[in-house]
Amino acid sequence: MNALDLPKAPHETRVVVAMSGGVDSSVVAGLLKRQGFDVVGVTLQLYDHGAASHRKGACCAGQDIHDARAAAEHLGIPHYVLDYEDRFRDEVIEKFAESYLAGETPIPCVECNRTVKFRDLLGLARDLDADALATGHYVASRALPGGGRALHRALDPARDQSYFLYATTAEQLDFLRFPLGEMEKTETRALAKELGLSLAEKPDSQDICFVPQGRYSDVIARLRPDAARPGEIVDLDGHVLGRHDGIVHYTVGQRKGLGLSGPEPLYVVRLEPDAARVVVGPRTALATTRIRLSDLNWLGEGPAEAVRDLPVAVRVRSTRPPRPATLTVGPDGAVEVVLAEPEDGVSPGQACAIYADDGPRARVLGGGTIRRVDALSARPREAA
């Protein structure tokens, strides 16, 4: 086996590297090239860059395409730029807008990985007769004794991206490789300098690529100019406290920007899109221990349908560590997560990544989209 767990000599092994123009994917390309693999770089143009082309901290911006091309030229590997704007708009941006209008808090990076990157780009890699598709994600992939591969949290906990990759299927994992999963970021930057890459000190991307300055409502207004409608801001008992200009301006757990005053801080507890209503309450009303999921991607042992009260750990936000929970998949396919301790600010539309345990290198068992959150103390929803 070579360094990528493939039964071929490196020079006979073609690897397509998804090059975003950042330091991580460029180092992956350089590292594999140095190890003797037949490396082909591919960069995806995903959206109309416009003003974001030169905006610092943006992912996949126009400058990144230039940087990816320059890195490939420096490394002496072929490089292709593919226009995936239509696919990205249909599979990611439009779904993002619909989810927000439904009162959810979507995670577009999960959908992008699920579709454009690990479905469409992986298919392209196969068309190029590649043996593997490698990316610069900080997540680990390990061979399983009985065949196939397992996904694990990265060595560098501060960089671990497993939360965004839970939807990767077992079939995709067989073809994917993540060389940075066993490295820390400082080591990656040191390798970039060693490889002579000019972007060794390039800042990491911070924003979602199509959301300038994190202003989601601006994106929704552009995509659905007539969708936002004003409505009431009410407390848990239905008393009107104020008005708003559209639920797209709010997300569960939000405190700032409500324009309300009172004896205690108020937070967005839930959004009711059919009534254009924002429900607010005290922080205690955000707590939940019971979450329902849809679109389960199962990477664990055995069929998902056999899972009953399985001890696991889950992450309901990328910034939070895995927390102990139990997982049950009902006979009808309903997926329920019961948390050992309450979590605050869990919103429909968010991702829930499932792990075998809460350890630093835990195996990823899959995950799903949060569809329902049962609050501990919130009043029952009024009938629509």
From Swiss-Prot:
Localization (cell): Cytoplasm
InterPro entries listed in its UniProt record: MnmA-like, MnmA-like_C, MnmA-like_central, MnmA-like_central_sf, Rossmann-like_a/b/a_fold
UniProt cross-references to Pfam families, sorted A to Z: tRNA_Me_trans (PF03054), tRNA_Me_trans_C (PF20258), tRNA_Me_trans_M (PF20259)
Gene Ontology molecular-function annotations: ATP binding; tRNA binding; tRNA-uridine 2-sulfurtransferase activity
Keywords, sorted A to Z: ATP-binding, Cytoplasm, Disulfide bond, Nucleotide-binding, RNA-binding, Transferase, tRNA processing, tRNA-binding
Residues with site note (Interaction with tRNA): 137, 350
Active site: 112 (nucleophile), 209 (cysteine persulfide intermediate)
Gene3D superfamilies: Adenine nucleotide alpha hydrolases-like domains, HUPs, Translation factors
SUPFAM superfamilies the record matches: Adenine nucleotide alpha hydrolases-like (SSF52402)
Chief place where the protein resides: cytoplasm
Disulfide bond entries: 112-209
Binding positions for ATP per the UniProt entry: 18-25, 44, 136
GO CC terms: cytoplasm
Function: Catalyzes the 2-thiolation of uridine at the wobble position (U34) of tRNA, leading to the formation of s(2)U34.
Protein family (similarity comment): Belongs to the MnmA/TRMU family.
Protein's name in the database: tRNA-specific 2-thiouridylase MnmA
This protein's encoding gene: mnmA
